[in-house]
C-alpha cells in the first residue's frame, strides 16, 4: 500500500482553471452547481452554497451551515471529511470537483489528526485500519507505549524539558577542543558579542565579552549582567546579588536562527561557537528572557487513538492460549511443498520452461544447499512437489528465512543454458511470536531489482508484495500436532550447558570436531596475537574456514577482546543449535562495544534478533545525539534488515526522535523519502504514523513543509512536461505568475527549512528566484531570513529544489565527507571541507543548499576570456583569487585553497567519485574549494565508447597547482607543493585508520537500492583505494603513486574540461 504519485490539483490535471464549476450535494437531496475560484476556501464555498440553496426547493429542511462539513473523494480514492475549512479548493486534491454536505459524526479531533498524519506521510491512515495482519495491529498498539513514555519524558521538568525537546543543544560529542582549534584562541579565551533588545521597536544594544572558552552559558550570562550593570556603580555585594537573581532568568540564542544554549555545556562545545573559532569570526549571541521562550512553547497532549482499545485479532496460539511444543523436540528434516504459480507473464517463444529455486538462508548465508523444483512449461506452472532440505528443523536459527524465485531456463543447441529470475520472494520461517510457520500460504512476489546477479535475493524484504497483480506462488509447510515455538532463553541456556559438558568429554582426535572444540585452556601467546590480528581485519576481509574454526575454538577467550564479536559471529555455524545456543549465552554477557563497532552488527550479515538487540543496547549506552544525527541515514536503512515490525532498533530510534526534535525532523524525512518504495512503505508508514502521533505541535510544521514541497513538485512537473518546449522567458513568466497566486504564497512562505529546522524561511524574494538550465528544470529559490538578528548570520536563504534527480547518492557522499572532516579535525588536520546541506525528500525529489559567494571553475575560467575558457591559460584561477583577496588576505586565501584542495583530493580518490569537470568543482571568494554533484562514486565513472572518460585517480590540474604554489612556474619544486603533499599524506592515513567505519557505513546502505551501491563488490573499491591488504608504508607509497599520476596526467583532465566547456556553451 504505497502512496500514490501526485497528479496535480485534480485527477490528471496539474493546475485547476482560475474558475471551476463544483457540484455540491446538499442533505435535502438538492444538487447545486457553484462557480468557484480555484483558491477559494471551504468556508467561503459553504457560505456561498447556503446562500444559493435558499433559491432551491426544500431549503427549509437545512439547518444552520455551521452544523455541516464537506466530504468528497480524493485522488487516493479515499472518502475524506474536510473539518479544516480554511483549506483551499485547489489543495484538497479532489478526484473530481464534487462536494457533498454532511453532518459530522464520530470523534472530530481524532479524525482531524488522522487527516493531518495521512497528508504528511503520503497515505491515508485508514489504510492501516484495514490491514488484517495481526503483526501490524499489535505493532500499532504496542508502539504507542514508546510514544507515551517519550511524551511523558518531555514534560518531566516542564517547561525546561519541553524547550530541550524543541530546541535540543547543537553540540559536539566531546567537550575537548582539538589543539589546532585551541591555538586560534587568545590564551584559551574567546571574544563573544552579546546582543540585547532594549525597546519594543527592537532597538539593539551590544556588549563585547572576553571569556574562557570552557565557560558554561550561565557564566557568560553572569558576565553580560556584570558588564550591563557596570554603569550603575553597584557594590560588589549588590553586584553579586544582582547576578544571582538574574542569571537564571535569561538564556542565550544564536543571532539569526533558532538555536539556543539551554544546557551547561562548555561554550566551545556548541557547534556554532566552535565553527566561529575555526573561521576566526566573533560569535553573536542574543540575551533573552527564559520566560519569553517558555511561553512560546506549545504544551503537547498525547491521546491514545481509538484503535488502541480494539481487541487483538491474533490467533489463540499467538496469545499463548493453546498447547505448544518446542522446536527442539521435532525430529524431522525441513520440507516445503511448492503447489503452483499464477500471473507468471513470460514470452513462450523466448523461454523453454520455468522452475522454482528455493533456499534456506540466515542473512546472506545459505544454511544448506539450494533446492529446485522440476521444470514445467510456462503455460502450466503447477508442481505439487515436496522439496526436502538438508537441515533438521531443530537446527533452524531464529532468523532463518525461505528464499524463493521463479526462474526461466532457455537453452540453445550446443550452447549453455541461460537461467534468469522472473520474480522473487522471502518468508520468515518464524513469525513475530516465535512460532514456526505451517500450513498453506500464497506469496505475491517482487520484481527483480536492477543489478541482481544471483537467482535468489536473500537480503531482500520478507513478506508478500501488496500488489496482487504480480506473480503469486502457492506453497505449503508441514503441519504439526501442536503449535511449534522457538525455545526461550532458559531452555537455550540449559542446552548450551549440556553441549559444553558433552564437548568436554570428546577427545581432540574425534573425527570432524577436533578443529571446533573449545581450546581456551591451551591458549598460547601467538594464539592471542592471531586473535588480535583477526580482530583488526576490515569487515570485507574474507575469513577462511580454518580461521573460523580457530575463532570458535577460542570463543571464551574472545570475550576479553569485545570488539572481535562481529568476526566471532561470522564463525558460528548457524545451522547447528549447539553452537547457536552457546553463542547466545556468550552474547548475553558480552561486554559493550563502541557504537561504530556495534553498527556493523546491524547490517545484512547479522540477522539474528539477539545479536541485533545487543548492538542496539550498545548504541543506547554510548551513542551521543550528535553521533546519532551523523549516522541516522544508515540507522534508518538497516530497519529494512529487521525481521519484524517491532524491534529494539525501531523503539530506540523512535524514542530519540520524540525526545529530540532535530533528530525527529530528519528521521521523518529519511522515512518519508522512501514511501514510494513498495517494499518498505508499510513498515516506514507505520513508523511515521507513530512518530506523527507523538511529535506534538511539530506535526503542524511538518504539514507546512510537506505542503510547500507538494506545490514545488507540481510546479516543476508542469515545467518539465507542459512547458518544456517554451523559452526560458516564458517559463519564468509562468513561474512568477503561479508563485504570486494566494495558495502558492501561503504555502511557500513562513515555514521551517527541511534542510535545517533551525532556519526559518520567510517571504519569497521572487525577483531572485529562477529556473536553472538543466533538463530537470531545478528551481533556484530565495527566501528572506525573518529572524530579528538576521543581518548577523545571513539575511537570505537560497535553496535549489530538484525534481527528477536521485539525490540519495549526493546525500550519502556529503555525509561521508562530513565524517572525514570530523576525523581530520580531531587529529589536528584543518582541511576545511564544505559538506553543504542536501536532503532527499521523495522519489527523485530533493533540496540542495546554495553555498554563498561561490563560483564554478568554468565560470571563473570564462572570466579570463577565450584562452581561460578553453584552458589555454592555466593562471586564470590564480589571478581571479588574487583579485578577490588583495593585500594581507592573499596568503590566507591560498592557504585555504591548499587545505580544501588537499581534503577533496583525498576524499574523491578514496570514494572513487567520478564525472569531475569544471562545472562541478567550485571555489568561494575567500579561496575555499569544494566539489558538488556526486552522481557517480565507487569508481562508477562515465564511459565514452566503452572506455572510462576520466583517466586520473583524482583532479589535480595545473590550474590548481599554480594556485597552491602562489603562481610559480615550476610548482612541483616549491615548498608550498611539498606542504600540500604532506597534508594529503596525513589526511589519507587518518582515513585509513578508520577504514572499518566507512566500510560499515556503506554496507549498511546496501538495502537502499542505489544503482551504484548494489553489492559488497561495490564497497570493495574502498578496500582497494585504502590499500587495506598492505602495510601502512606500502599504502602510503601506493597513494604517492596515485598523486603523481594525478598531477602528471592533469593534461587529460584539461582536455575533458575543454570539451565540457564547449558543450556547455553550445547548450546555452
UniProtKB/Swiss-Prot annotation:
Residue ranges constituting the C2 PI3K-type domain according to the UniProt record: 330-487
Residue ranges of coiled coil: none
Cross-referenced SUPFAM superfamilies: ARM repeat (SSF48371), C2 domain (Calcium/lipid-binding domain, CaLB) (SSF49562), Protein kinase-like (PK-like) (SSF56112), Ubiquitin-like (SSF54236)
UniProt note on tissues of expression: Detected in the hypothalamus (at protein level).
PI3K/PI4K catalytic domain sequence ranges: 765-1051
E.C. designation(s): 2.7.1.137, 2.7.1.153, 2.7.11.1
Domain (PIK helical) ranges: 517-694
Enzyme class: transferase
Domain PI3K-ABD: 16-105
Alphabetical keyword list: Angiogenesis, ATP-binding, Kinase, Nucleotide-binding, Phagocytosis, Proto-oncogene, Serine/threonine-protein kinase, Transferase
Pathway annotation from the record: Phospholipid metabolism; phosphatidylinositol phosphate biosynthesis
GO CC, alphabetical: cytoplasm; cytosol; intercalated disc; lamellipodium; phosphatidylinositol 3-kinase complex; phosphatidylinositol 3-kinase complex, class IA; phosphatidylinositol 3-kinase complex, class IB; plasma membrane
Comment block on domains: The PI3K-ABD domain and the PI3K-RBD domain interact with the PI3K/PI4K kinase domain. The C2 PI3K-type domain may facilitate the recruitment to the plasma membrane. The inhibitory interactions with PIK3R1 are mediated by the PI3K-ABD domain and the C2 PI3K-type domain with the iSH2 (inter-SH2) region of PIK3R1, and the C2 PI3K-type domain, the PI3K helical domain, and the PI3K/PI4K kinase domain with the nSH2 (N-terminal SH2) region of PIK3R1.
Record's protein name: Phosphatidylinositol 4,5-bisphosphate 3-kinase catalytic subunit alpha isoform
Lineage: Eukaryota, Metazoa, Chordata, Craniata, Vertebrata
Amino acid at each position: 500500500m504505497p502512496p500514490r504519485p501526485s497528479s496535480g490539483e485534480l485527477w490528471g490535471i496539474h493546475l485547476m482553471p482560475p474558475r471551476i464549476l463544483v457540484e455540491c450535494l446538499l442533505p435535502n437531496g438538492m444538487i447545486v452547481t457553484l462557480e468557484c475560484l480555484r483558491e477559494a476556501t471551504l468556508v467561503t464555498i459553504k457560505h456561498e452554497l447556503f446562500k444559493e440553496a435558499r433559491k432551491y426547493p426544500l431549503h427549509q429542511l437545512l439547518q444552520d451551515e455551521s452544523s455541516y462539513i464537506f466530504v468528497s473523494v480524493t485522488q487516493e480514492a479515499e472518502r475524506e471529511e474536510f473539518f479544516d475549512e480554511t483549506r483551499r479548493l485547489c489543495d484538497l486534491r479532489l478526484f473530481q470537483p464534487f462536494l457533498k454536505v454532511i453532518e459530522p459524526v464520530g470523534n472530530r479531533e481524532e479524525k482531524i489528526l488522522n487527516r493531518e498524519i495521512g497528508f504528511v506521510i503520503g497515505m491515508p491512515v485508514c489504510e492501516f485500519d484495514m490491514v488484517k495482519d495481526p503483526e501490524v495491529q499489535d505493532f500499532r498498539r504496542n508502539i504507542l507505549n514508546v510514544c507515551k513514555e517519550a511524551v511523558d519524558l518531555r514534560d518531566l521538568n516542564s517547561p525546561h524539558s519541553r524547550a530541550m525537546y524543541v530546541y535540543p543543544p547543537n553540540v559536539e560529542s566531546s567537550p575537548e577542543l582539538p589543539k589546532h582549534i585551541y591555538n586560534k584562541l587568545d590564551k584559551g579565551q574567546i571574544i563573544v558579542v552579546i546582543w540585547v533588545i532594549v525597546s519594543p521597536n527592537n532597538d539593539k544594544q551590544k556588549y563585547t565579552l572576553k571569556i574562557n572558552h570552557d565557560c558554561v552559558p550561565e557564566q557568560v550570562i553572569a558576565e553580560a549582567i556584570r558588564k550591563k550593570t557596570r554603569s550603575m556603580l553597584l557594590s560588589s555585594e549588590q553586584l553579586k546579588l544582582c547576578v544571582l537573581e538574574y542569571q537564571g532568568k535569561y538564556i542565550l540564542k544564536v543571532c539569526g536562527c533558532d538555536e539556543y544554549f539551554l544546557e551547561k555545556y562548555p561554550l566551545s562545545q556548541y557547534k556554532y561557537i566552535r565553527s566561529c573559532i575555526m573561521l576566526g569570526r566573533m560569535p553573536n549571541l542574543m540575551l533573552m528572557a527564559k520566560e519569553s521562550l517558555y511561553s512560546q512553547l506549545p504544551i503537547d497532549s498525547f491521546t491514545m487513538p481509538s484503535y488502541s482499545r480494539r481487541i487483538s485479532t491474533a490467533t489463540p496460539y499467538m496469545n499463548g492460549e493453546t498447547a505448544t511444543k518446542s522446536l527442539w523436540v521435532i525430529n524431522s528434516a525441513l520440507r516445503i511443498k511448492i503447489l503452483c504459480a499464477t500471473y507468471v507473464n513470460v514470452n513462450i517463444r523466448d523461454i523453454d520452461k520455468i522452475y522454482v529455486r528455493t533456499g534456506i538462508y540466515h542473512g546472506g548465508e545459505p544454511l544448506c544447499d539450494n533446492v529446485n523444483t522440476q521444470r514445467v512449461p510456462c503455460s502450466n506452472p503447477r508442481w505439487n512437489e515436496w522439496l526436502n532440505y538438508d537441515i533438521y528443523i531443530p537446527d533452524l536459527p531464529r532468523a532463518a528465512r525461505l528464499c524463493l524465485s521463479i526462474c526461466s531456463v532457455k537453452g540453445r543447441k550446443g550452447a549453455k543454458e541461460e537461467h534468469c529470475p522472473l520474480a522473487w520472494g522471502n518468508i520468515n520461517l518464524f513469525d513475530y511470536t516465535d512460532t514456526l510457520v505451517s500450513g498453506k500460504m500464497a506469496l505475491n512476489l517482487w520484481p527483480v531489482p536492477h543489478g541482481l546477479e544471483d537467482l535468489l535475493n536473500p537480503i531482500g524484504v520478507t513478506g508478500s508484495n501488496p500488489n496482487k497483480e504480480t506473480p503469486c506462488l502457492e506453497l505449503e509447510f508441514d503441519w504439526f500436532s501442536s503449535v511449534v515455538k522457538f525455545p526461550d532463553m532458559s531452555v537455550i541456556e540449559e542446552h548450551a550447558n549440556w553441549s559444553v559438558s558433552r564437548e568436554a568429554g570428546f577427545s581432540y582426535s574425534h573425527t570432524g570436531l577436533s578443529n571446533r572444540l573449545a581450546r581456551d585452556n591451551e591458549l598460547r601467546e601467538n594464539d592471542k596475537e592471531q586473535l588480535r590480528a583477526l580482530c583488526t581485519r576490515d569487515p570485507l576481509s574474507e575469513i577462511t574456514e580454518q580461521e573460523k574454526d580457530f575463532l570458535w575454538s577460542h570463543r571464551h577467550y574472545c570475550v576479553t577482546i569485545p570488539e572481535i564479536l562481529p568476526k566471532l559471529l561470522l564463525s558460528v555455524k548457524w545451522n547447528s543449535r549447539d553452537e547457536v545456543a552457546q553463542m547466545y549465552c556468550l552474547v548475553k554477557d558480552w561486554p559493550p562495544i563502541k557504537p561504530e563497532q556495534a553498527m556493523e552488527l546491524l547490517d545484512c550479515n547479522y540477522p539474528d534478533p539477539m545479536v541485533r538487540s545487543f548492538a542496539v543496547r550498545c548504541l543506547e549506552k554510548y551513542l551521543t545525539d550528535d553521533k546519532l544525527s551523523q549516522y541516522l541515514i544508515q540507522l534508518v536503512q538497516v530497519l529494512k534488515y529487521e525481521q519484524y515490525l517491532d524491534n529494539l532498533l525501531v523503539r530506540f530510534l523512535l524514542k530519540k526522535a520524540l525526545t529530540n526534535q532535530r533528530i525527529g525532523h530528519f528521521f521523518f524525512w529519511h522515512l518519508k523519502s522512501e514511501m514510494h518504495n513498495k517494499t518498505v512503505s508499510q513498515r516506514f508508514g507505520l513508523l511515521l504514523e507513530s512518530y506523527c502521533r507523538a511529535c506534538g505541535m511539530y506535526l503542524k510544521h511538518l504539514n507546512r513543509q510537506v505542503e510547500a514541497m507538494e506545490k514545488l513538485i507540481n510546479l516543476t512537473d508542469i515545467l518539465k512536461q507542459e512547458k518544456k518546449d517554451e523559452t526560458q522567458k516564458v517559463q519564468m513568466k509562468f513561474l512568477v505568475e503561479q508563485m504570486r497566486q494566494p495558495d502558492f504564497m501561503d504555502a511557500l512562505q513562513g515555514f521551517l527549512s527541511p534542510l535545517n529546522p533551525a532556519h526559518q524561511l520567510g517571504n519569497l524574494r521572487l525577483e531572485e528566484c529562477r529556473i536553472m538550465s538543466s533538463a530537470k528544470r531545478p528551481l533556484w529559490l530565495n527566501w528572506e531570513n525573518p529572524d530579528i538578528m538576521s543581518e548577523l548570520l545571513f539575511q537570505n536563504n537560497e535553496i535549489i529544489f530538484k525534481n527528477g534527480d536521485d539525490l540519495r547518492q549526493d546525500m550519502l557522499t556529503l555525509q561521508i565527507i562530513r565524517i572525514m572532516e570530523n576525523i581530520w579535525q580531531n587529529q589536528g588536520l584543518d582541511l576545511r571541507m564544505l559538506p553543504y546541506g542536501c536532503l532527499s525528500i521523495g522519489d527523485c525529489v530533493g533540496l540542495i543548499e546554495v553555498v554563498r559567494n561561490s563560483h564554478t571553475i568554468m565560470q571563473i575560467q570564462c572570466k579570463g576570456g577565450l584562452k581561460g575558457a578553453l584552458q589555454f591559460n592555466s593562471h586564470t584561477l590564480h589571478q581571479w583569487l588574487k583579485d578577490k583577496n588583495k593585500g594581507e588576505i592573499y596568503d590566507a586565501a591560498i592557504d585555504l585553497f591548499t587545505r580544501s584542495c588537499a581534503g577533496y583530493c583525498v576524499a574523491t580518490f578514496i570514494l572513487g567519485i567520478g564525472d569531475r569537470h569544471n562545472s562541478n568543482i567550485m571555489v568561494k571568494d575567500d579561496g575555499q574549494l569544494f566539489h558538488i554533484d556526486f552522481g557517480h562514486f565507487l569508481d562508477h565513472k562515465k564511459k565514452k565508447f566503452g572506455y572510462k572518460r576520466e583517466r586520473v585517480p583524482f583532479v589535480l590540474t595545473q590550474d590548481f597547482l599554480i594556485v597552491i604554489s602562489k603562481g610559480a612556474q615550476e610548482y612541483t619544486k616549491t615548498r608550498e607543493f611539498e606542504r600540500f603533499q604532506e597534508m594529503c599524506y596525513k589526511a589519507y592515513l587518518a582515513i585509513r585508520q578508520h577504514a572499518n567505519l566507512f566500510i560499515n557505513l556503506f554496507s549498511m546502505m546496501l538495502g537502499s537500492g542505489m544503482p551504484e551501491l548494489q553489492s559488497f563488490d561495490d564497497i570493495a573499491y574502498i578496500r582497494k583505494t585504502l590499500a587495506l591488504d598492505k602495510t601502512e608504508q606500502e599504502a602510503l607509497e601506493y597513494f604517492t603513486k596515485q598523486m603523481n599520476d594525478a598531477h602528471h596526467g592533469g593534461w587529460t583532465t584539461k582536455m575533458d574540461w575543454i570539451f565540457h566547456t564547449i558543450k556547455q556553451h553550445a547548450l546555452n
